[in-house]
Amino acid sequence: MESINESYDDSSSFGQDSLLYNRPFAYLYLSFHLKLLYSVPASYIAMIRAGSVGKKSTCEYTYWDDGVGEEVMGDDSWDYEGRKISHIYVAFDEVIMSIQFGFLENGALVLSKQHGGIEEGSNFRVVSFVSITIIYFCVCVRSGQVLFLMKFKRS
């Protein structure tokens, strides 16, 4: 099992409310200030702001459309404006396969679209929050490793 090292610097982009997933999926430390501790140089991190801002991501990628064999290039819309994220659903194996956000609207749980794919036999975790309005979400690929970083901001 890989060792996990604490690397906290007030000037870094991580801060107290960060959650870093690394390959392989290591120990999760769940507390009010959710975080997984691992050393990653800040130069490998590029943040995508999601949550209440309703902006598009800035990274370009290729994904498969609903049509047979259609490949589409472009940005993904983060249309969560005005909603409070209450849950994050994470499917993982050796790496994180998908992330999906949940919102409470009129007492009912409403799910966002799934970001990523899921394979049969994947593990599944649900992270519940109260009053989370903004999430900074990052996906980095470096030397064959897939890194996911989520930074939470309470309202």
Curated annotation (Swiss-Prot):
GO terms for cellular component: membrane. Keywords: Lectin, Membrane, Transmembrane, Transmembrane helix. The chain crosses the membrane at residues 26-48, 127-149. One of its GO terms (molecular function) is carbohydrate binding. The keyword Protein transport does not apply. It is a multi-pass membrane protein. Gene3D superfamilies: Jacalin-like lectin domain. It comes from the Eukaryota. Belongs to the jacalin lectin family. This is Probable jacalin-related lectin 26. It comes from Arabidopsis thaliana (Mouse-ear cress). The gene is JAL26.
